[in-house]
Amino acid sequence: MLSKAHAKINLSLDVIGKRKDGYHLLKMLMQTIDLYDLIEIKKIKKDIIIDCDREYIPKDRRNLAYKAASLFLDRYNIDSGVRINITKNIPVAAGLAGGSTDAATVLKIMRDIFEPDISNEELKEIALDIGADVPFCIEGGTALCEGIGEKITSIKNFKNQILVLVKPNFGLSTKDVYNNLKVEKIYIHPNTTKLIQSIEEDNLESVARNMRNVLENVTLRKYKTLNSIKSNFIELGALGSMMSGSGPSVFGLFDDMLKAQICYDNMKEKYKEVFITRTI
């Protein structure tokens, strides 16, 4: 069984506190985009086997797709295994939920193969044990995600919007970025309410003005390349530009495909991983 595993971007990312167990409390507006990996799963007699077209992708429990399959098989006492083939298109360690969306897609395919009556809500319970972005990736679309990612409220779909996405030639550790964030020193927070209102009113310029990611407080200071990419996007006609998730991917939001294509061509001269895509 073959399925697409779509990446996500953040239209906003706010950190509003930190729990005693170390988890940060988040308020994020998440959006699925039309950039995806391909996941194919076949039922086998035993074990979990991961195949991938990228040699650097781990094939063991470090891979979230493996973890998803293992949790699913254990939870439902399934006495067989799966072979998972992953074709990667989403950049790795990029703030685009590449591993999380693969895991979510594995859960959905395995439901179809083994336990078709399981609800999305039940899948999200398993998903939260894998990672904060995985529950959102079960549903996709446009949603406000709060807590540690478990509180998901769907809003009007912000679909068919034009994006150019740049992944610079380095990856970032989500854990390291959050560990270097000083919550008490976040002085400007996203106006998430205004951002949602702008989406509901189809006001693209207001959406662009209200996009904000507090993790840029960490990354923009350390990686000047990210400042340069954001500035280049605005110079090349983007309505707004922001880092997605914990980075380092940066996207520009456009209202015109010709401008987006010119921007893409320009960025492609400087960076290897550049994409034109849309929200879905």
Swiss-Prot record:
* Class of the enzyme per the UniProt entry, highest EC level: transferase
Pathway given in the UniProt record: Isoprenoid biosynthesis; isopentenyl diphosphate biosynthesis via DXP pathway; isopentenyl diphosphate from 1-deoxy-D-xylulose 5-phosphate: step 3/6
Query: Binding residues for ATP, per the UniProt record?
Result: 91-101
Q: Which GO terms describe its molecular function?
A: 4-(cytidine 5'-diphospho)-2-C-methyl-D-erythritol kinase activity; ATP binding
Q: Which GO terms describe its biological process?
A: isopentenyl diphosphate biosynthetic process, methylerythritol 4-phosphate pathway; terpenoid biosynthetic process
| Annotated active site | 8, 133
InterPro entries reported in the protein's UniProt record: GHMP_kinase_C_dom, GHMP_kinase_C_sf, GHMP_kinase_N_dom, IspE, Ribosomal_Su5_D2-typ_SF, Ribsml_uS5_D2-typ_fold_subgr
EC numbers listed for it are 2.7.1.148
Q: Name one Pfam family in it.
A: GHMP_kinases_N
Q: Which UniProt keywords apply?
A: ATP-binding, Isoprene biosynthesis, Kinase, Nucleotide-binding, Transferase
List the catalytic activities from the record. Answer: 4-CDP-2-C-methyl-D-erythritol + ATP = 4-CDP-2-C-methyl-D-erythritol 2-phosphate + ADP + H(+)
Q: Would I find Transmembrane helix among this entry's keywords? A: no
Q: Which family does it belong to?
A: Belongs to the GHMP kinase family. IspE subfamily.
UniProt cross-references to PANTHER family, sorted A to Z? 4-DIPHOSPHOCYTIDYL-2-C-METHYL-D-ERYTHRITOL KINASE, CHLOROPLASTIC (PTHR43527:SF2)
What the entry lists under HAMAP family is as follows: IspE
Function recorded in the entry: Catalyzes the phosphorylation of the position 2 hydroxy group of 4-diphosphocytidyl-2C-methyl-D-erythritol.
This protein is called: 4-diphosphocytidyl-2-C-methyl-D-erythritol kinase
Organism encoding this protein = Clostridium botulinum (strain Langeland / NCTC 10281 / Type F)
Taxonomic placement: Bacteria, Bacillati, Bacillota, Clostridia, Eubacteriales
